């Protein structure tokens, strides 16, 4: 009689263990999900701090106490639990450049939003924009390359045309000196008879032959006193009248 009781008890123990453990696990999972849902009701602490500073718009910067009060009023958070996270966010934000500390040190003092915070958001959302910019840049480069090739071809054509014009101008200049040389050869032939005529015209103007007789006359005139001297010589001989003195 004892054996059938044991056999009946054995199947009862096996189903009791399995259903008891399964509902405990199922009951634990919704609590964890609820905790996760509660934690995800607010954005990251640094983003809340930046939003509080930009909303308050204080000239000298916002203090940690005012940032906490703004977060408690606008977000579903428990500041007693979140206070250490706010201090950590302030320190890390100043170190990374997302926040700028105007006065104070550490988590105390006044804070402003840094200039590095905006570019970070742009980088997160600009993954597709980067691809578009890369495509646009490639298209622009291709257009610039085509335009540069066209410009180079146009410049080459212009240079070739200019070279042809220069060659034609040089050929014309080389032909022109031949005509000038022929003209220069003709000019001396015309001047040669003029030079021969000039001495023939000047020869009759000079009256050297007429002046020669005047000189001869002058010479003859000068010689006349010599003849007078010859005539006077007999007078000198006549002075010898010594016999007249003797007669006295």
From Swiss-Prot:
The entry's keywords: Chromosome, DNA-binding, Nucleus
Residue stretches of biased makeup (Basic residues): 9-39, 118-248
GO annotation terms (biological process): nucleosome assembly
GO molecular function: DNA binding; structural constituent of chromatin
GO CC terms of this entry: nucleosome; nucleus
PROSITE patterns reported in the protein's UniProt record: H15
Keyword Nucleus appears in the UniProt entry: yes
Xref: SUPFAM superfamilies: Winged helix' DNA-binding domain (SSF46785)
Summary of the tissues where the protein is detected: Sperm.
Renumbered residue ranges of the record's region Disordered: 1-46, 115-248
Disulfide cross-links: none
Acetylation in keyword set: no
Occurrences of domain H15 (ranges): 41-115
Subcellular location: Nucleus; Chromosome
Domain of life: Eukaryota
Pfam families reported in the protein's UniProt record: Linker_histone (PF00538)
Chain's role: Histones H1 are necessary for the condensation of nucleosome chains into higher-order structures.
Similarity section: Belongs to the histone H1/H5 family.
Protein name: Histone H1, gonadal
